[in-house]
A protein has these predicted regions:
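Acidic/His-rich, divalent-metal-binding segments that scaffold phosphate/diphosphate chemistry
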Residues: 294-420, 463
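Histidine-centered active-site/metal-ligand motif
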Residues: 343, 396, 425, 449-450
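Short, charged, surface-exposed loops that flank catalytic or proteolytic processing sites
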Residues: 413-414, 491-501
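Histidine/acidic-rich helix-loop-helix segments that form or flank divalent-metal centers
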Residues: 106-109, 154, 370-393, 433-478, ...
């Protein structure tokens, strides 16, 4: 259909939109990349035919698709993802700009898309909470304008207002260095209480449990207003988390079971003096989170639970007796991304074997790593290198948790934009490993395993090989990661299927460019090569 899109009949276009709707329908995400491709093509056609109603509708849905991609970027600094946020916001801003033609547009559905696009310009990350709040306030003013309401009385204005108040209630900043004005806090408090009271009414009418999410929003803003102490706020969050129905995977329960712990940890990160009093609670909380997540039905695709897991992966705090961050991440991968988990285990084991071979030949090879250099007993040093290499390999791809749907559910080659987005897994993986004591030393492997030895290609630019004391092990992880991906996932990267021998020959052709000559020299040793081959097979 794409080949003759400009000649397509209205019924065919409607069928294409229906197909796209099944790819991304809110709760389920089958293929958001293809969803965006379809709406980008439909938008081009609508621009060509100058169909204003279609342009507005397609801009809205393309923005929704791009927002879905942006939602995967939780935990990544705005500077690294501003381009993607701008691409999303431009779609909504262009559609919202048609507000000036609101009076002359006859189609009520199109008017609805204009208003929804206006509200959605506040989606995603902003440089400050105040900037986001300002955009939402402007939307509220538009939605409360009687002239607009009179012009389109058929639209669900109350619903639009409620959703925008909900957006405002979730805009509070949780940073210790508060970037909100006093008026910002007042505005958020008004919206939070409006939403909470409506949710209480709805839950009573439906005979449901009291709302948890909106209660937290109220508590958070009351804390910022000085109505609650931090201790009282944390205590109330604990009570909300204790209300989780572990047998239910409703949005409310998923929020309470996984997202609330993320906010709880964020407060403890911002106020570490509170941590000692709550270590025991935190240590008991993580197993509950994992138990709940692992019970999630495997045949269901719910992007919301992945979003909440990304939140908790970003704010996770280790304590002396809690599950380690590395183990927490591996538990998530086993359940939700088993292919990524297996790949990481293979890379870890093979990296450790190759590093052991190198160490036996050159005992000082890894001495740029301070803790390795400090070990004088060779047997102890050998074990330390093996363990270090294993952990670097096992954890090098933790950033892929942000892009679970792309790495584990897409049985097709990626689109160019998806290739670009998945490169962010190195940045987010590095950031997360770097913040926890048990994984800090392995962060370089997450950042640098896609860089090239000579620096001519690869990513990210923030990895500076010569300045990294872990570069020798990062080089090994990068080589083994490439071999395994080329061997077992060529379709994902658009490569033809190759056998092990062909892949090794290709690696040798990249000697001194992509791969360190110190490593490729080992690939010319038949005994070493056979050892690596057998490790791949057994792993």
């Amino acid at each position: 259909l794409f080949d003759r899109l400009f000649e397509a009949q209205p019924t065919e276009l409607a069928e294409l939109e229906e197909f796209a709707g099944a790819l991304l329908n809110g709760k389920n995400e089958l293929d958001s990349g293809l969803f965006c491709q379809i709406y980008q093509a439909l938008l081009s056609r609508a621009r060509h035919t100058k169909d204003r109603n279609a342009i507005i509708r397609y801009l809205y849905w393309l923005g929704i698709g791009r927002h879905n991609m942006c939602a995967k970027m939780v935990g990544i600094d705005l500077a690294d993802i501003e381009y993607y946020m701008s691409q999303m916001r431009l779609c909504f801003a262009e559609a919202a700009a048609y507000l000036k033609y609101f009076d002359e547009i006859d189609d009520v559905e199109t008017k609805g898309y204009i208003l929804r696009s206006r509200a959605n310009t506040a989606l995603g990350q902003f440089k400050s909470a105040s900037a986001k709040i300002r955009v939402i306030k402007q939307t509220l003013q538009i939605l409360q304008d009687k002239e607009y309401q009179k012009n389109a009385p058929e639209l669900p204005w109350d619903r639009y207002l409620y959703m925008t108040h909900q957006q405002m209630a979730s805009s509070i900043s949780y940073n210790r260095d508060n970037d909100m004005t006093a008026q910002d806090v007042v505005t958020i408090m008004e919206s939070a209480h409006i939403v909470h009271q409506q949710r209480i009414t709805e839950s009573l009418n439906k005979q449901e449990a009291p709302p948890i999410r909106t209660a937290f929003s109220c508590y958070a803003v009351e804390y910022y207003c000085g109505l609650l102490t931090l201790e009282e706020l944390l205590g109330r969050i604990e009570k909300l988390m204790n209300q989780v129905d572990t047998s239910s995977f409703s949005l409310e329960n998923m929020y309470a079971a996984i997202s609330l712990p993320a906010f709880y940890c964020q407060y403890l990160r911002e106020y570490p003096e509170q941590l000692s009093k709550r270590e025991k609670y935190l240590e008991n909380l993580y197993p509950k989170v994992l138990s709940y997540a692992e019970a999630f039905p495997k045949n269901e695709a719910n992007e919301q639970i992945f979003f909440y897991l990304r939140q908790l992966s970003t704010t996770f705090i280790e304590t002396p007796h809690s599950i380690s961050y590395g183990d927490f991440q591996q538990n998530i991968m086993i359940h939700f991304a088993p292919d990524v988990y297996v790949h990481s285990q293979v890379v870890g084991k093979t990296t450790a074997i190759l590093c052991d071979i190198i160490l036996l030949e050159e005992p000082n090879f890894f001495d740029d790593i301070e803790q390795i250099r400090a070990i004088t007993n060779f047997d102890a040093k050998r074990q330390a290198v093996y363990d270090f290499a294993m952990n670097c390999g096992v954890l090098h791809d933790v950033g892929k948790i942000n892009f679970i749907n792309l790495f584990s559910r897409t049985a097709r080659q990626w689109f160019d934009e998806e290739y670009e987005i998945t490169r962010l897994h190195t940045i987010v993986g590095h950031k997360r490993l770097d913040t926890c004591a048990s994984t800090h030393n392995y962060a370089a492997a997450a950042l640098g395993h896609h860089s090239w030895y000579d620096g001519s290609h690869g990513y990210p630019e923030t990895y500076k090989r010569l300045a990294c004391p872990y570069r020798q092990i990062v080089d090994v992880v990068g080589l083994i990661d490439w071999i395994d991906n080329t061997l077992n996932r060529p379709w994902l990267y658009g490569h033809p299927k190759k056998n092990f021998e062909e892949i090794i020959q290709e690696a040798l052709s990249l000697e001194g460019k992509r791969f360190s000559p110190l490593l490729t020299a080992r690939l010319r040793d038949s005994s070493v090569l056979e050892h690596i081959r057998q490790t791949f097979l057994s792993a």
